[in-house]
Amino acid sequence: MISMAEALQRTPLYPLHQGARFTPFGDWEMPLQYSSILQEHQAVRQQVGMFDISHMGKLVLRGEGVLGALQTLVPTNLSQLQPGQAKYTVLLNEAGGIVDDVILYMGDGQVRCIVNAATTAKDWAWFQKYLPASIEVIDESASQVLIALQGPAATATLSPLCDRPLGEIKTYRHAPVNLLGQPAWIARTGYTGEDGWEILVPAELGQQLWQTLLAAGVTPCGLGARDTLRLEAAMLLYGQDMDEQTTPLEAGLDGLIDWQKPDFVGRAALLAQKQQGIERQLVGLELLGKGIARHGYPIYAGAQAVGEVTSGTLSPTLGKAIALGYVFPEFAHIGRELAVQVRDRWVPAVVVPRPFYRRPRSTAKI
């Protein structure tokens, strides 16, 4: 009989994570924490930490006219996207629901697409369905390691290992580099709210890079800290804060939509929803009493149930409990007093602006 651990997939860096506490994450066995979630969280906010995110999907869309084809499919305007630039967007179904949120990295004649681990096969099928047959969809997930190096000291840490100045690669830019003397690809993107890099290398180089960064004093971090960091930055987690029954208008992602585009997958449904009005809206909450809001906890206005929490934690940086959730639009304005049912108690809460945390712009150490 196969145990759960044996059935789960492992990244190529798994042998280097011994000593970590592991957790199932979708179909993967991933490090939850190495030391403590608090220590790992603070390392990223104050210095630098690294995450094994090799479980994420790594698709390459290749062929003549690939950018033009994508421009007709996603709601975001990609027309000005140049090689070396990246764009955050969403893939939608015909009803306007979010199939996945992705980052598209424009290259010469190809677009690299980093997708959520649990949706890799679904996203591959989405691209196969909507892209013309002349565009090849290649899944490089199994052969590549992806490491996120995040924090104010991330650039200073990575620079000595690369063959080019990193200061010239701005946020949401990417480039090929020689890393430890071997070809690699880096992007100035992340999921923590801090300056940082996502580094894509062949599996064998990935182990060497991880050990080199570890020897340089970089704190290894697990999914626990990754979750508290992204939540402070109010970055949504697919499958928890949004899914195929959630539209960008409901999730506060309407800034990704270019309504001037004549067509994209889901446009008609989104336009109808825009005209009719949404029935629920994503909000940020700060809890004013003791208790932590968790996924699925109900949100109240007086005795009326008005919504539900999707993510919540005790913010290490802010020292207070924060949450994301959906409420009826009439209860979504900043300053609105609500309550979250935490087990058998009602904890007062207030709607606050997102993100909960925004990094000081002067913290990056070049």
From Swiss-Prot:
UniProt keywords, alphabetically: Aminotransferase, Transferase
Q: What is its EC number?
A: 2.1.2.10
**Which GO terms fall under biological process for this protein?**
glycine decarboxylation via glycine cleavage system
Cross-referenced InterPro entries: GCS_T, GCS_T_bac, GCST_C, GCV_T_N, GcvT/YgfZ/DmdA, GcvT/YgfZ_C, TrmE/GcvT_dom1
Q: Which reaction does it catalyse?
A: N(6)-[(R)-S(8)-aminomethyldihydrolipoyl]-L-lysyl-[protein] + (6S)-5,6,7,8-tetrahydrofolate = N(6)-[(R)-dihydrolipoyl]-L-lysyl-[protein] + (6R)-5,10-methylene-5,6,7,8-tetrahydrofolate + NH4(+)
Determine the domain of life of the protein's source.
Bacteria
Q: Does the keyword Transmembrane helix apply?
A: no
List cellular component terms (GO): cytosol; glycine cleavage complex
- Does Protein biosynthesis appear among the keywords? no
GO terms assigned for molecular function = aminomethyltransferase activity; transaminase activity
Q: Kindly give the SUPFAM superfamilies that the UniProt entry links to this protein.
A: Aminomethyltransferase beta-barrel domain, Folate-binding domain
Family per similarity comment: Belongs to the GcvT family.
What is known about its subunit structure? The glycine cleavage system is composed of four proteins: P, T, L and H.
Described by its record, this protein's role is as follows:
The glycine cleavage system catalyzes the degradation of glycine.
Q: What is this protein called?
A: Aminomethyltransferase
